[in-house]
């Protein structure tokens, strides 16, 4: 147990300083799963058991948003390589043939927001994290004008973009990672506010939007109601 404690302490101390990606390719349960969950990203092989406590006891990882991607071995390793392409200190900004000031003739804002994001970012390339968790919000890494950035977007096709508990925690976690590694964040707001059953601790987690130090740009793309409007306004002009 002391060794487990030392490992977890080392992982925690490295947080915000070193990019940490855990790849779960086999059985990972109990304390090992807890340590993996402390990494910045967890990528899991589709058939790999991954939980702190068993599903029968309510500890199934699918309910906790424990991984940012799950697929077969080739897809998982490809996803990890793509992540490394977007995190500073593991990559550099690159030249793009897409003009930053190009005219976007049509953005399908009423459709899945991913279509709009593909039109906005360089070369239509982005890598989504936690795609199956907190689905009213889309979080992804991309490049705009050759500059690597994080993207947070309301997905209006999922309950009119109303922010749920999972979506709030997902947003807070993603923004913390962007802030840690100095990635600017582009926010596309398209939300009818908060879900009726969202707990207060999840609402509080959203106020990380107010405390992030990384550059941010917010764009109200369609709908911006109530608390969501206030949160996006709590930032210093840049």
Model-identified regions with their sequence ranges:
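Ligand-binding clefts of soluble mixed alpha/beta catalytic domains
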Residues: 1-238
């Amino acid at each position: 147990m002391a060794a487990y404690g030392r490992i977890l302490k080392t992982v925690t101390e490295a947080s915000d300083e070193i990019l940490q990606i855990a790849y779960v390719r086999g059985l990972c349960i109990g304390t090992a799963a807890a340590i993996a969950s402390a990494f910045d990203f967890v990528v899991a092989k589709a058939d790999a058991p991954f939980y702190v406590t068993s599903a029968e006891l309510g500890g199934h990882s699918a309910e906790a948003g424990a991984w940012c991607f799950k697929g077969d071995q080739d897809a998982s390793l490809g996803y990890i390589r793509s992540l490394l392409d977007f995190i500073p200190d593991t990559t550099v900004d690159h030249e793009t043939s897409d003009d930053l000031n190009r005219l976007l003739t049509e953005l399908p804002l009423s459709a899945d927001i991913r279509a709009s994001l593909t039109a906005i970012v360089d070369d239509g390339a982005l890598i989504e994290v936690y795609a199956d968790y907190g689905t009213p919000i889309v979080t992804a890494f991309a490049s705009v004008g050759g500059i690597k950035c994080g993207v947070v977007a309301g997905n209006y096709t999922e309950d009119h973009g109303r922010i749920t508990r999972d979506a709030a925690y997902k947003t807070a976690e993603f923004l913390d990672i962007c802030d840690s590694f100095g990635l600017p964040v582009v926010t596309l707001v398209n939300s009818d506010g908060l879900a009726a059953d969202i707990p207060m601790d999840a609402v509080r987690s959203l106020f990380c939007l107010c405390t992030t130090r990384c550059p941010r740009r917010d764009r109200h793309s369609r709908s911006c109601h109530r608390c969501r409007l206030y949160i996006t306004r709590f930032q210093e002009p840049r």
